[in-house]
């Protein structure tokens, strides 16, 4: 049985990578071209992120999308 959904995994990885880079949610949102509240909702697993926005966030963090999906 899988205890964490893919949204939870993405949320955890996003928050960890963002903090490692010393970025606020607002700074990351500006780099990715999305709204700050959207980043917050993703980090709380409240939003089902699209592939296009996954790509924007990965580029903004300078990582591969797969790094955001690793369990």
Please give the residue ranges for each predicted region.
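Short basic helix-loop element that most often maps to the first helix and adjoining turn
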Residues: 12-27, 31
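A detector for short, charged/polar N-terminal pre-domain segments
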Residues: 1-9
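Conserved hydrophobic/aromatic packing and binding residues within compact polymer-binding modules
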Residues: 14, 28-29, 39-42, 68
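Short C-terminal boundary/hinge segments that cap the last helix of small helical domains
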Residues: 62-71
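Short, basic-rich loop-to-helix N-cap that marks the start of a DNA-contacting helix
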Residues: 46-56
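DNA major-groove recognition helix of helix-turn-helix
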Residues: 43, 53, 61
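Recognition helix of helix-turn-helix/homeodomain-like DNA-binding domains
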Residues: 34-47
């Amino acid at each position: 049985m899988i205890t964490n959904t893919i949204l939870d995994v993405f949320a955890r990885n996003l928050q960890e990578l963002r903090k490692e880079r010393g970025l606020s949610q607002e700074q990351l949102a500006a780099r990715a071209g999305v709204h700050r509240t959207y980043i917050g909702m993703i980090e709380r697993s409240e939003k089902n992120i699209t592939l296009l926005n996954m790509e924007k966030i990965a580029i903004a963090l300078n990582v591969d999308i797969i790094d955001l999906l690793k369990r």
